[in-house]
Amino acid sequence: MLRFRSLGSGSSGNATLVEAGNGVHVRRLLVDCGLGIRQLDARLAQAGVAPGGIDAIFITHEHGDHIGCARAFALRERIPVWMSHGTHAAIDAPDFDGLLRVARDAESIDLGELQLQPFTVPHDAREPLQLTCTDGASTLGVLTDLGHATAYVLQRLAGC
């Protein structure tokens, strides 16, 4: 089963929890990590998720309300972080201690029970990506900041 929960939205910080799987095998993805680390910990606790229960982080773009505590949280919990090359080049955090993974437009990311499909969007950032998430039965489109809906964006979200 595919589930999502907004942990924060807006200029004070964006974070979305996406979960896939049954009660025994659950994959958890954090899309954006724009909150402060204590606030993120508290909101994960409210959702019944331990910080170490996150399997991956996907950063959509380099703006502070999306990237916030991503590096500190990833390093503390040893969680891989996916972002575009352009996003990584735009931030002042070159070292993710081997946890950085490069996400590319239309290249699938396999997290076991959860598959991600990043896609480019128009936005005032260096190389912003949004994504769809699927568990094989359902598909969720995650769209945070978007300049406007292009034909490509609509194509990528078809079926969500």
Place the predicted regions along the sequence by residue.
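Metallo-beta-lactamase
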Residues: 83-137
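Conserved Rossmann-like nucleotide-binding pocket used by diverse enzymes
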Residues: 58, 117, 142
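Structured loop/turn residues at beta-strand edges in well-structured enzyme cores
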Residues: 49-52, 98, 114, 155-159
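A structural signal for the main folded, soluble domain(s) of proteins
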Residues: 3, 29, 52, 98, ...
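Conserved beta-strand hairpin/beta-sheet module of binuclear metal-dependent hydrolase folds
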Residues: 1-47, 127-145
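Active-site-proximal loop/helix segments of hydrolase catalytic cores
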Residues: 141-160
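Structured catalytic core of nucleotide-sugar glycosyltransferases
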Residues: 2, 6-16, 61-70, 74-75, ...
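Active-site metal-binding motif and surrounding structural segment of the metallo-beta-lactamase
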Residues: 37-83, 159-160
